[in-house]
Amino acid sequence: ANTGSLGAKVNSFVKKNYQDSKADLYSVFIERCAQMIVHGGYQAMITQHSWMFLTSFQKLREKMMHTDTISMAHLGARAFEEIGGEVVQTTAFVRRNSSISDYYGTYCRLVEPSTQQGKADLYLSGTKCYVARQADFVKIPGMPVAYWLSNIYFELFSKLPTLSNSVDFCKGLATMDNERFLRLWEEVNWKNACVTAIDAAGGKESK
């Protein structure tokens, strides 16, 4: 649940004590559980997978990548038969409360099967498991847990500048002058319209 929807008291407590995970209550539990693990201890959780990718969880990812070592079964949607639809997408992960230099985690991608049994069978087959160096995620802006990328992509992120450092982004898919370029259908004079042209040349000839 979004912490902002849980009332002023909870929202205030979370903002004060869990700055890095305040985007959602489940991510607060991720951070809180980390505080309860002894150094070198292990902990397993099943949570929504949004913390792996979204910007609002970037600080939490950064903390986890620098303090924990992680292995994962990325479950995706329909991991539990009791929960239908694509809305709830989950991941199961085990983390060790210690940072290991050059640690390679195992990540099983189980997002494609649409049933609980299908995901279990795919996991046991071992055909969709990746071994990824956790430190490589740091090379990607925003630090998403993109475990399926090959080494060449991580090298490109390390060597090449990002687009944001090279160009200025502005509004996309906009005419910048709607009064000049856009017309509502009722504004067009039917006598000047052509509905039989099959290409641009035909439309031009009909003028």
Predicted regions and their residues:
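Signature of N6-adenine DNA methyltransferases within the class I
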Residues: 1-197
